């Protein structure tokens, strides 16, 4: 399995391979690289899709130190550099979008486009931080995981039980404490609203109409704050991971966007 060492982390990724233009994707909190299985199937082999496991998720390993989304962005660039790729389109869902934005800020000339699903440039409010801390503390704690896992599946994934089952199986059989440092990273995400105007590449933004993580105004504010051309789409009936439950619609939007980039 492919791994790259990056500042105390052994970062796992999946690479569809090929010589097509590269698209680097980061998953939402609690998820892993398999969140993008549908997109890899739809985009490859015309595009080279690279899906990265963030620290605290999937097969990526890391030391016990704290980290930020800037560190995750550097992890992602380490993967890109390891693969010998110069220019990429970067994207992600939720926290994966946080990472993508910071990738674009770290290396602007190397990013040809952004694909952001359920994402914002703002820090969380005090109310949001308290709410997320309650959820992650319950997840990491010693109480029954099944109840909280089913609640998280309903909120993040939405859809129906068939969409939930593969992820519930992963969560209930895994190490529930692995997300502790990742939870701190998420809850303490910094506000980059005053920086995103420097991102001038084209951007595709998508929000599930029932996404509990970010409301319409938050994503609209991000769309308008970016320094380049940006389009914002809402997927009716979708929650935080529309690429999972409404894959055909997301795949089509991504293919159209990538086509307009000439990639």
Regions found by a protein language model. Name each.
Residues 202-238:
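Conserved loop-alpha-helix segment in the C-terminal half of the alpha/beta-hydrolase fold
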Residues 101-106, 111-141:
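Flexible "cap/lid" loop of the alpha/beta hydrolase fold
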Residues 92, 96, 100:
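Gly/Ala-rich beta-loop-alpha elbow adjacent to hydrolase catalytic centers
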Residues 7-65:
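Conserved HGGG/HGGXW glycine-rich cap/lid loop of the alpha/beta-hydrolase fold
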Residues 125-130, 142-197:
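Conserved alpha/beta-hydrolase catalytic His-Asp/Glu region
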